Amino acid sequence: MEHTLFGCLRSPHATSQGLHPFAQSSLALHGRSDHMSYPDLSSSSSSCILTGYPNEESMFGSQHHRGHHHHHHHHHQQQQHQTLQSNWHIPQMSSPPASTRHSLCLQQDSGPPDLSGSPSILCSNTSSLGTNNSTGAACVTGDYGRQSLSPAEAEKRTGKRKSDSSDSQEGSYKSDVNSKPRKERTAFTKEQIRELEAEFAHHNYLTRLRRYEIAVNLDLTERQVKVWFQNRRMKWKRVKGGQQGAAAREKELVNVKKGTLLPSELSGIRSNSLQHTADSLTNDDSHDSSQSSEHAHL
């Protein structure tokens, strides 16, 4: 029998004698009718599962057409089939399609699958003998470490990376700026400050020639002299503005004590008096109108 129930259970290195287990068992029936010889299933080293489930006619149909079998042998074959069903409890199922039949059985002759390439797909057979699931292959991708990210999460990660890189760049730039040594302030001596103050009392602004002369006399650079005069002018303006404000406040206090008023105060008083007179006139008009209405009512 070429297509038997044990076609997938046999070992790939088995001899040609294992191809026809039923033929051997049928030959053994000539001598012994009460004992059946079955193939040793425990010694089978095949990892292939049962893929085809032929029915009673497909399993033993070929034995009916053999010319050397007799009716007595056919009776024992039916008894063998019944005993086989009672021992193994093989369910009667419709044979699956040929495409799924070949896809479920693993070939031992071929080597292990090459896992060194791109992410492989590991297929696990979930079909059992008691179910009618013809496909039964749950395919799981082999790339377990990688997880699919949503576009929002990817954008968040890229934005975070960009912000981190920008922060690191800003921090490096600030560190570079802070690492640059500041220019040391010029420490003027008392004699140099005295000469510069005397010159500033006469001239707030220096000509180029005079600046050169002062720099040579005081052993300074022209830039140092120029910067000192710039700073001194700013200080003088601040002091002058403060003095002018203080002088104006003192003058107002003196005028208040004397009883005299400033022109600004006089203008304010005049505007207030004009507003008061206008209000009084409106009040008088309203009072007259109310009195006339009362007389008319009487």
Curated annotation (Swiss-Prot):
Molecular function GO labels: DNA-binding transcription factor activity; DNA-binding transcription factor activity, RNA polymerase II-specific; RNA polymerase II cis-regulatory region sequence-specific DNA binding; sequence-specific DNA binding
GO biological process entries: positive regulation of transcription by RNA polymerase II; regulation of transcription by RNA polymerase II; somite development
Compositionally biased residues, Low complexity: 109-122
Transcription is among the record's keywords: yes
Domain of life: Eukaryota
Pfam family, one: Homeodomain
Bias kind Basic and acidic residues: ranges: 153-165, 177-186, 284-298
Subcellular location(s) per record: Nucleus; Nucleus speckle
Segments for region (Disordered): 57-122, 143-186, 277-298
DNA-binding region: 181-240
CDD domains associated with the record: homeodomain
Key words, A-Z: Activator, Developmental protein, DNA-binding, Homeobox, Nucleus, Transcription, Transcription regulation
Major localization class: nucleus
GO cellular component: nuclear speck; nucleus
Biased composition regions of type Basic residues, renumbered to the chain: 63-78
Biased composition (Polar residues): 83-108, 166-176
Function: Mesodermal transcription factor that plays a key role in somitogenesis and somitogenesis and limb muscle differentiation. Required during limb development for normal appendicular muscle formation and for the normal regulation of myogenic genes. Also acts as a negative regulator of angiogenesis.
PANTHER family for the chain: HOMEOBOX PROTEIN MOX (PTHR24328), HOMEOBOX PROTEIN MOX-2 (PTHR24328:SF1)
Domain text: The polyhistidine repeat may act as a targeting signal to nuclear speckles.
Name of protein: Homeobox protein MOX-2
Organism annotation: Xenopus laevis (African clawed frog)
Name of the encoding gene: meox2
